[in-house]
Amino acid sequence: MGLITLILALIVVLFVCVFASNSSKPANNASFADNGAQRTAREFGPAARGGELLEFERWFKDTLATVFAQKAEKVANPTRAWNAETVFDNLSPWTSAADFGTVCHTLIGYCVRYNSPGDALHHSPDLANNLISGLRAICARLPDPPPHQQAPWGPVADWYHFTITMPEVFMTVTIVLDNTPHYDEAAALTRHWLALYLPTAVTSMGWHRTAGNAMRMGVPYAYGQLLRGYSAQQIAQEPGVQETLKTVAFPYVAAGNGLHPDSIYIDHLDVRAYGYLINSFFTFAYYTRLFGADVVNTEGLTRAIENVGSPEGVVVPGVMSRNGTLYSNVIGNFVDYPIAVHSADLSKVLTKLSDSYYGAVVGATTRLAYYEADPTNNTQAPLWTMTRRIWNRRARVINYNANTVMFESGIILQSLNGVLRVPSTTTSTQSFRPAVGKTALAKTRTAGAILVHARFAEMNNLQFKSCTLFYDHGMFQLYYNIGVEPNSLNNVNGRVVVLSRDTSVNTNDLSFEAQRLNNNNSSDGSAFNGVVCQRVPITNFNVPSLTVRSPSASVELVEQIISFQNMYTASAVACYKLNVEGHSDALRAYRINMDEVVYVTTGEGVKALFAYPWLMLKEDAAVVFMSANEDLVVPMSVINNAFSAIDEPGLQYAPVNCFLYGNGFRLNDSLANLQFQFEIIN
């Protein structure tokens, strides 16, 4: 009898060891699908709520409102009425994939309300019932097994709602219901359906996803694995998770997709396209929480956002979407933006954020696209390449519409209606690089300057040299050598937009025409939405006067007219400045002799010299040089000639980030910085 008892005890111990060994292995979705008994025990039993799962769920709830504020695609503060059949009224989510997406986003929005202590629906039992009922309704309609390379319903292109948003619904509903009687059911449904629709961190419905899509998929996948009892360490070793962690690591790359050494985000190989980054940014907090602070290049990503964004959500259009926008509803929540000037010397982006305004310019380089078109968006190339303006941070944000998107400050118009198409010749996206693209940037403590030489073959060989200076409360802009393909304008004069007014928005500003009449028939000083424009005369340049025009009833413009004859000979000029309303300055600009040298002084300690290919910027005791040719050595003759041109020939200086090299100075490190910095010592 004792021997039999001992044998039985050994069998029990052996069974426990085998079970423990199996439970430590990564999820096997094939065996999950084949083994009904294992599926019932594993997917519909109570959640294995270990320490890591509990800690993650608690942290998720504590940070939900903050992270939700960083999420671009969402329904915030939903009030839509609930419906027993369709989850919400006036939707058809079981036949329309778009409506299904709306249901998903609305459920997540209600989860945020349920979780927010100050909300009237905080921990509402009725809302908790509605949330679990919504989850049940989704589960009742989803195909099991999932379709292969096809959306459960609707067009194949609508896979996104089922692969990206739906798993986030399962995760969010489950976590916010953790202290309710519904939690075990929600957790069981999440384990089951995520195993089907997210079998790995990078696959769904037969497709393998990468980049921004994989970033989104990885978080609910990892949560599903936590629910199954796996540790974060085990989850991190799975091949799909490893693949995603390599993506979110954002190592610096010299070319192609990812974060370039000067912290500009590149997508589609050569496009400054921040869309994926903006849509996925909120996930980085989850990855660092689950897998450690070092799994994400937080420093580089922070700089990438600072390089283009603002607290108000205004972003220079040249890094945004193909349909033309200057605004992100979430980027202002990503980082704490310092008052600073940022320059990306290799990717050619200059940004200034002051107390009073945000301004940025995207320059040109043959390494990167100046525009990306697709079959339905092909008219924003001028917006991406020529936006030259500031936005008053105390004024309202007015985004573009179909009537205004062609008429931004700085755009060189080749027709009266502003339409200039650069179409894709493929069925997908197509990027276009400049035929000539050379840019120098310089920044000091409060000022930034950018010198651009560009030619764009697809825009009638439009070419120009552009000189921009950002300084306290204002921006200076000069175009010279503006030209196009001869005889391409039908002998119609070109125009440069100085200031644009959206007439559908009431800002209490008078029309430009009324302001002109009230100012002795002069448009100098015309204002809209907190920004004032002025013509800037320059010695030895024929700078056009400011004129007013209304291309349609929806938009009114202050412009400078440039003759088609001058554009045909690449000799057209335009020059203006923009100031924050309520501020003025004593800015002056001079052409030195008849050379290609322009000296600009603000009268308040900032001086810029645009001496193509060299750019110099001086502020107080700091002086910076950069070459549009990206030279690694600045000759002493360039420095001395620049100081003479700004009437300070006797300046003594010491190198800061460069060293004496023959008859010039060589940069210490040119990996991401191409600006030569000097300190004035007398």
UniProtKB/Swiss-Prot annotation:
Annotated Gene3D superfamilies: 2.60.40.4340, Baculovirus E66 occlusion-derived virus envelope protein, domain 2, Chondroitin AC/alginate lyase
Lineage, highest ranks first: Viruses, Viruses incertae sedis, Naldaviricetes, Lefavirales, Baculoviridae
Keyword Membrane tagged: yes
Role description: Component of the polyhedra envelope.
Protein name as annotated: Occlusion-derived virus envelope protein E66
The keyword Transport appears for this protein: no
Family: Belongs to the baculoviridae E66 family.
Location relative to the cell: Virion membrane
Matching Pfam families: Baculo_E66 (PF04850), Lyase_8_N (PF08124)
Keywords: Membrane, Viral envelope protein, Virion
Domain of life: Viruses
Main location: virion
GO cellular component, one term: virion membrane
Source species: Orgyia pseudotsugata multicapsid polyhedrosis virus
InterPro entries, sorted: Baculo_ODV-E66_core (IPR043082), Chondroitin_lyas (IPR008929), Lyase_8_alpha_N (IPR012970), ODV-E66_C_baculovirus (IPR006934)
